[in-house]
Amino acid sequence: MKILIKGAGDLATGIAVRLHHCGYPILMTEIEEPLTVRRMVAFSRAVYEGEAVVEGITGVRVQTPEEIRKAQQAGKIPVLVDPHAAIRTAYQPDVLIDAILAKKNLGTEVTDAPFVIGVGPGFTAGEDCHCVIETKRGHTLGSVIFRGSAIPNTGVPGDVGGYTIERLLKSTSAGVMEPVASIGDLVETGEIVAYTGGEPVYAKMTGIVRGMLQQGVNVEKDLKIGDIDARCETSHCFTISDKARAIGGGVLEAVVQFERIYRKYAVIVLAAGNASRFGSNKLLADVQGKPLYRHMLDKLAGLGAFPRILVTGYEEIAEAAEAIGVCTVANHQPELGISHSLKLGLEKCKSIEPEVKGVLFCVCDQPGLSLSTMMELIRLAVNRPGMILASAHGNRTGNPVLWDREYFSELEKLSG
């Protein structure tokens, strides 16, 4: 299973190391001039040094698909200068992790890969990604969020050794970065640790320089250029942090969960009813500015990890579904009832994926149904083999419903 990580800073590196240790092939992308403060524990350093070794694992700068392949075969992590991760189209990762840590989404979409993970604030699970990893220090650090967002950025760094804002080093002027202190040096309060744009930057506390931007990089005023650690443990400067390990653990948990369901379940949407009670084709009715059926297709677009089948007798709906890679089955006999659509969809599903473990059956007229709910039912199914799982509101169950393959033969006998 191929994994693409956007960003190669220290937190992204913590993620990459966790995944690498578990045998996943990794590709990381970076900007041309990385601004990683904790660069001694970041594979982004490979961009300007050619390679970077972090806890025995080597990250190496690459430029071509062949170099990516060779680096992975050699047990290394390739780092590609590709600010927008355009390599995604050719590389076709199974999992995409946005670990840029920009505190906002810079363009990642839930359709970028079968499984998309957003790291930190700026992402919403079920909208622009499948899950979010909490990055704020504290009780929930490293948590996997399958519905909603991470804690918003407060602008105040987490407590390390009893210090928060004081431990940050920020540029005093825009211009070229000129470090005076090196990573691992002990500095005193008031000591000059760097110059930015020719202006001195002073330490606000005593401690060890845990991170510092590289010589010659261009910075804006008030940019974080370094940090000081009051704990004065030199080894902390050259090893992955507790925060990065926790975040990496959260990502690993999400990836393993996804791997257990990847291509093992299917989604079938029933959209062939003649809407006799509605009086016309309700799936074409405008709901919140677009046809009703479009709401379901938007959800299906984010479920590319699974075979997706839509049963319909309407050409417009079929064409729209096929345009996003959804397989369609024609049902020109809606009068035979919903069971006919169900059987047509199940037959097609079994021809595509004979060993599918279960099917999530959905109806097409639920605009309020969320992608998160659909994913949750599939994730629950893997730990509840042989069961029928349904969504519910209060004590009332309804669609969608996930049927284990154990019941396929009975479903195929239904009528009406």
Task: Please state what every model-predicted region is.
Residues 3, 265-267, 359:
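Conserved hydrophobic helix-helix packing surfaces used for dimerization/oligomerization
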Residues 294-358, 372:
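Conserved N-terminal catalytic core of the sugar/cofactor nucleotidyltransferase
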Residues 32-34, 263-315:
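N-terminal glycine-rich phosphate-binding loop and ensuing alpha1 helix
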Residues 101-103, 122, 273-275, 315, ...:
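Short glycine-rich anion-binding loops that position phosphate/pyrophosphate groups of nucleotides
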Residues 335-405:
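Conserved beta-loop-beta/alpha segment of the NTase-like Rossmann-fold superfamily
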Residues 43-49, 325-328, 346-348, 407:
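Short, hinge-like loop/turn segments at secondary-structure boundaries
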Residues 406-416:
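Active-site oxyanion/phosphate-handling segment shared across diverse enzymes
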Residues 1-262:
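Well-ordered secondary-structure scaffolds
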